[in-house]
């Protein structure tokens, strides 16, 4: 597909000794260069905060859906281009908004309309208009969604004017393998491949009969896509927390996006390194509030909201103001990504992930991931 030529390249720089699929690499897009693993902070184009006005941000994701639904924003983005509209000179992915269209039960979105928006707004990368699967739908409806995604992929990859990311989906390893094969028939070796339909598995399928362990299925799915596209950067869509971020990175995911920093702030939560969601003030409603050890972490936070303030001032501001929580949360997300990258390069990635994931919801899933690593190593020795 000629639209990729000379615009995007992805080259391995470092592979971890313990996790066979984990790597750091260089991604080059439109003469911009960045180290993986990546974290794209989701941003709503017409709303504050603009995080890059508060601290250094390299990568942002916006949604075509959010732009199309607001005519004023659409016109301005198309006139100025998305970088100038946002006042941001880093890398921007524009997602097609397939997940949002799914929630509205809209399957008749015209991929050519999305292509036109991409061409006029000029993000660094676009995403093929995909129709994510729904784990609660019947199999035929999900097959219909994949066929529409495949049709869109063929049309958009052949006619797009900017680099586009194809996305694979599947709620069984057999279906996911077929999805990978279908995309390879269009583009055998895309520089970037996306894995979608992950978010509904986490939030809709806990305890379901079909997915007795949805997170372990996600782990297996990530491994399959990495093996099917070993030379492609792997992006997984819609990761919510820093702990899920570390789990995905430890599996060999090269790139993630998250709106979690904003959504958690909207619910009144803040993030802290290595800790789950916390509410700044204990309101006796059963929600997890700051412990004494959490307060110690908060007292040394250097985010733009917390710096130069007493602990009491930090707690009061984070409890009362959404924007302050959002900026603080995004800072923690970025710092956790940067720390992971540092640990990867100095050879302590395993110890770091083990520390971050040893407690909480993802601890047993990290153990499952480690068991699979051991099995892979034994198989390679036997061969």
Can you annotate each of these PLM segments?
Residues 148-150, 275-282, 373-374:
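Short, structured secondary-structure boundary patches
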Residues 2-4, 159-312:
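Glycine-rich phosphate/ribose-binding loops and adjacent secondary-structure elements
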Residues 116-119, 151-154, 158, 181, ...:
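Surface-exposed alpha-helical segments enriched in charged/polar residues
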Residues 1-30, 34-43, 133, 297-383:
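C-terminal extensions of enzymes
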Residues 107, 138-149, 172, 207-214, ...:
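Residue-level preference for long, well-ordered alpha-helices that form the structural scaffold
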Residues 41-42, 66-68, 98-100, 132-134, ...:
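Short, solvent-exposed loop/turn segments at secondary-structure junctions
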Residues 1-160, 382-383:
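Non-catalytic, usually N-terminal nucleic-acid engagement modules in DNA/RNA processing proteins
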């Amino acid at each position: 597909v000629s639209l990729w030529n000379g615009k995007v390249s992805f080259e391995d720089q470092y592979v971890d000794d313990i996790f066979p699929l984990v790597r750091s690499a260089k991604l080059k897009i439109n003469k911009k260069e960045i180290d993986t693993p990546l974290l794209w902070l989701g941003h709503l184009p017409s709303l504050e905060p603009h995080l890059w006005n508060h601290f250094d941000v390299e990568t942002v994701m916006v949604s075509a859906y959010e732009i199309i639904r607001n005519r004023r924003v659409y016109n301005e983005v198309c006139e100025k281009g998305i970088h100038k509209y946002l006042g941001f000179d880093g890398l921007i992915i524009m997602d097609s908004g397939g997940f949002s269209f799914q929630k509205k039960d809209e399957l008749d979105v015209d991929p050519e309309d999305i292509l036109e928006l991409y061409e006029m707004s000029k993000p660094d990368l676009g995403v093929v208009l995909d129709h994510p699967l729904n784990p609660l739908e019947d199999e035929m409806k999900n097959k219909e969604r994949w066929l529409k995604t495949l049709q869109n992929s063929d049309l958009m990859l052949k006619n797009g004017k900017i680099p586009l990311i194809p996305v694979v989906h599947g709620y069984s390893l057999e279906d996911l393998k077929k999805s990978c094969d279908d995309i390879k028939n269009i583009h055998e070796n895309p520089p970037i491949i996306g894995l979608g339909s992950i978010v509904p598995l986490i939030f809709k399928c806990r305890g379901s009969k079909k997915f007795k362990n949805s997170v372990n299925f996600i782990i297996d799915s990530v491994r399959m896509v990495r093996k099917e596209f070993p030379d492609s950067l792997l992006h997984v869509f819609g990761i919510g927390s820093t702990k899920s971020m570390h789990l995905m990175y430890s599996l060999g995911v090269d790139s993630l996006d998250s709106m979690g920093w904003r959504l958690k702030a909207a619910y009144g939560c803040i993030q802290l390194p290595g800790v789950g969601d916390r509410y700044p003030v204990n309101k006796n409603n059963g929600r997890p509030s700051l412990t004494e050890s959490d307060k110690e972490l908060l007292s040394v936070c250097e985010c733009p909201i917390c710096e130069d303030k007493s602990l009491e001032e930090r707690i009061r501001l984070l409890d009362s103001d959404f924007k302050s929580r959002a900026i603080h949360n995004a800072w923690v997300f970025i710092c956790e990504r940067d720390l992971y990258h540092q640990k990867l390069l100095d050879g302590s990635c395993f110890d770091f992930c083990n520390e971050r994931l040893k407690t909480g919801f993802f601890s047993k899933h990290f153990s499952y991931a480690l068991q699979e690593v051991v099995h892979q190593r034994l198989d390679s020795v036997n061969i």
